[in-house]
A protein has these predicted regions:
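Polar-ligand-bearing catalytic/cofactor-coordination segments
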Residues: 1-209, 231-305
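Multi-pass membrane glycosyltransferase architecture that uses lipid-linked
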Residues: 206-221, 229-231
Length: 305
């Protein structure tokens, strides 16, 4: 448990200055009203879940290493994947901040898009963030029976039109119809196998993963491995997002709303609509706004609109 706390604490502290800088930027441009302390503790439920995941992973892997010696890494990789899948499954149950969507028109659109995308009914919920920020967002999460789509309430307000809201809804439902979250777990498995092997090799001289003194080195290796694999992970994420955009265009048949949505995002997110290549490689989990507008126009041209 102490090792899990150490691992989470180190990872959290390393990233904290960057998150503070990002929050300072949103405060400077009046995109957030949360003070620094309130902002830091706002995601305590997710942080607690991550802490439990790290503790569980370390306990199991250390037990496997003491039992199997250097052969722990393959079943250890399976443990990492199982915990990731479990976290994705239970995450919606940790959500205490959302309410059911009450917009009957948008709910009717959801039922129609679900039918076109071959989905069973997906709960659509709303997270109230307008007291804290003006930024807009929506996301899909959960797997199997816990699948959800969540709108920030700012996404359901001006300046976003009904057409833009429908595009966002279709995009998030497309993540579920294309099984992007299970696919993400599958990609994680492909990263976890070599990652576990590298952990085994690099911790050998410290007594292996079964020895407590090897844990700080193991945590460093994990951080470096994540940094090295970030460009590939971002490439995979951008492909999924582009696929969801394309599916959204197919069911809404409204490229103009997708284009205007991207213009709206450029104003509310404070992001660069056309970031340099290195930034997109290392930080871009979504296609650039310019690329997404180009997709909308290409779809319209193909349809002869």
């Amino acid at each position: 448990m102490l090792l899990g706390m150490l691992g989470l604490g180190i990872a959290w502290l390393v990233g904290l200055p960057f998150r503070i800088a990002a929050h300072w930027w949103t405060l400077r441009h009046d995109q957030s009203e949360l003070g620094y302390l309130a902002w830091i503790v706002s995601d305590w439920a997710i942080l607690a879940a991550e802490f439990c995941s790290i503790c569980l992973a370390l306990l199991i892997v250390m037990g496997l290493a003491r039992w199997l010696g250097e052969h722990w890494w393959l079943p250890g990789a399976a443990v990492f994947v199982a915990i990731a899948a479990l976290f994705n499954f239970v995450a919606p149950y940790l959500d205490y901040t959302t309410d059911p969507l009450r917009d009957k028109s948008l709910l009717a659109d959801a039922r129609r898009y679900e039918s076109e995308l071959g989905l069973s009914r997906i709960p659509i919920r709303v997270e109230r963030v307008s007291d804290d920020t003006d930024q807009a967002n929506a996301y899909a999460y959960g797997i199997g029976p816990t699948r959800r789509v969540v709108f920030w309430d700012t996404m359901l307000q001006e300046p976003f039109s009904a057409g833009e809201q429908r595009v966002v809804l279709a995009h998030e439902l497309a993540h579920h119809s294309q099984s992007h979250l299970p696919e993400g777990i599958a990609w994680f498995a492909l990263f976890a196998v070599p990652g576990a092997w590298i952990l085994m090799r690099t911790t050998r001289r410290r007594g292996g993963m079964g020895a407590p003194e090897a844990i700080p080195l193991a945590l460093l290796v994990v951080v470096v491995f994540q940094l090295v694999t970030t460009p590939l992970a971002n490439t995979i994420s951008r492909r999924m997002e582009a696929e969801a955009d394309w599916k959204a265009l197919q069911v809404t048949r409204d490229p103009a709303s997708l284009e205007s949505l991207m213009v709206g995002f450029s104003k509310t997110s404070l992001g660069d609509p056309d970031p340099p290549g290195w930034a997109q490689l290392m930080l871009g989990t979504h296609p650039s706004l310019v690329d997404r507008v180009a997709m909308a126009r290409a779809w319209a041209e193909r349809r002869g609109n």
